[in-house]
Swiss-Prot record:
Domain of life: Bacteria
Binding site for ATP: 198, 320, 346-349
Family annotation (PANTHER family): PHOSPHOGLYCERATE KINASE (PTHR11406), PHOSPHOGLYCERATE KINASE 1, CHLOROPLASTIC-RELATED (PTHR11406:SF23)
Assembly and interaction partners: Monomer.
GO biological process: gluconeogenesis; glycolytic process
Keyword rRNA processing: no
InterPro entries assigned to the protein according to its UniProt record, in alphabetical order: Phosphoglycerate_kinase (IPR001576), Phosphoglycerate_kinase_CS (IPR015911), Phosphoglycerate_kinase_N (IPR015824), Phosphoglycerate_kinase_sf (IPR036043)
Gene Ontology terms for molecular function: ADP binding; ATP binding; phosphoglycerate kinase activity
SUPFAM superfamilies xref list: Phosphoglycerate kinase
Name of protein: Phosphoglycerate kinase
EC number(s) from the headed UniProt entry: 2.7.2.3
Localization (cell): Cytoplasm
Length: 392
């Protein structure tokens, strides 16, 4: 991927417009998790340390375009950013009428981009209005890269220079390393409740990987495709044929979809449900599979430890309940111990990584939920394509 990087630009004396993703959650009117704000600091600090003035823009929540309500206000985000930077970060509400006059080291924030008419439709005039504020545009919002919007795509077309921020560049470099030139063998874990939501990812990865590990409800559908009884487990009977095709595709190239030989079952989906380990052949009609068994976990752990590249999306069991967390824990620890380059993404995956304390041992943790999944699907990300076009 050829794109310009912020860290390669001379920004001294320039105004830099950074599209960040600071769409943080709130609880009782206060920011409950500032991870996304902290993730944006590297690009902002690079600009400030190198003599630039900075304009930050972000979306917050899901406001109606053309309307402004108190909950849409980015002021609490700006205040928190200011406290992290040790600076006063003002919010600009009327930036189209009054272009800000900034000095080197200043940091300001535009009001919520999603209240601007034309933002979601990728309006070129709005993109030009954003671009008119800056000498250099920086996209550092990988989480929104799969959407073509005025603050991510149109602005990149119109700005004098368009480049990737520290976070965006790191994300794209890691994804490129994992998917474009992977060290072999390459192993992917794709887990979740439904094959239907991950079908295109499964099909795309089946072309790339040497082993395709499936988990959760997805694994149950594959077990059905192998003719196994799964009791009352969650599965999609209408996707059994698609599952067979994916297994055949993997087998034809000498790979496989290794399915569990033992599982952890329960009679109910509940935090206090009794967990029983069973051979896959012994699952009863009134039981549901809620995790992979210890033998299966050990076999998959060996695959992961011998891998050159690991892509992880989704826990293989109901890890929120400790009695069904063993499989996901074993795989998380195997990835942590592996010499493979590992990349993980998706909300549940990140929660599992945090729960089992292996954050530091994962090669790269992706910040972009939907964008990460679309990259795995092999889709073009509009905001990234815009940067590549400008970097060519």
């Amino acid at each position: 991927m050829a794109f310009l990087k912020l860290t390669e630009q001379n920004v001294q004396g320039k105004t830099v417009l950074i599209r960040a993703d600071m769409n943080v959650p709130f609880k009782d009117g206060k920011i409950s998790d500032d991870t996304r704000i902290r993730a944006s600091l590297a690009s902002i600090k690079y600009c400030v340390d190198n003599g630039a003035s900075v304009i930050v823009m972000t979306h917050l929540g899901r406001p109606t375009e053309g309307e402004f309500h108190p909950e849409d206000d980015v002021a609490p985000v700006a205040a928190h950013l200011g406290s992290l930077l040790g600076k006063d970060v003002k919010v600009l509400n009327d930036w189209r009428e009054n272009k800000p006059a900034l000095n080197a080291g200043d940091v300001v924030m535009l009001q919520n981009v999603r209240i601007n008419k034309g933002e979601k439709k990728n309006d070129l005039e709005l993109g030009k209005a954003y671009a008119s504020l800056c000498d250099v545009f920086v996209n550092d919002a990988f989480g929104t890269a799969h959407r073509a919007q005025a603050s991510t795509e149109a602005v990149a077309q119109a700005a004098p220079v368009a480049c990737a921020g520290v976070l965006m560049a790191g994300e794209l470099d890691a994804l490129g390393k994992a998917l474009k030139q992977p060290a072999r063998p390459m192993v992917a874990i794709v887990a979740g409740s439904k094959v239907s939501t991950k079908l295109t990812i499964l099909e795309s990865l089946a072309d790339k990987v040497d082993q395709l590990i499936v988990g959760g409800g997805i694994a149950n559908t594959f077990l059905l495709a192998e003719g196994k009884a799964i009791g009352k487990s969650l599965a999609e009977h209408d996707l059994v044929e698609e599952s067979k095709k994916i297994m055949a595709k993997m087998a034809a190239k000498g790979g496989s979809v290794p399915l569990p030989t033992d599982v952890v079952v329960a009679k109910a989906f509940a935090a206090d449900a009794e967990a029983v380990v069973k051979d896959i052949a012994d699952v009863a009609e009134d039981e549901m599979i809620l995790d992979i068994g210890p033998k299966s976990a050990a076999a998959l752990a060996d695959l992961l430890k011998a891998a050159g590249t690991v892509v992880w999306n989704g826990p293989v069991g109901v890890f929120e309940f400790d009695q069904f967390a063993g499989g996901t824990k074993a795989l998380a620890e195997a990835i942590a111990q592996s010499k493979a380059f590992s990349i993980a993404g998706g909300g549940d995956t990140l929660a599992a990584i945090a729960k089992f304390g292996v954050t530091e041992q994962i090669g790269y943790i992706s910040t972009g939920g939907g964008a990460f999944l679309e990259f795995l699907e092999g889709k073009e990300l509009p905001a990234v394509a815009a940067l590549e076009k400008r970097g060519a």
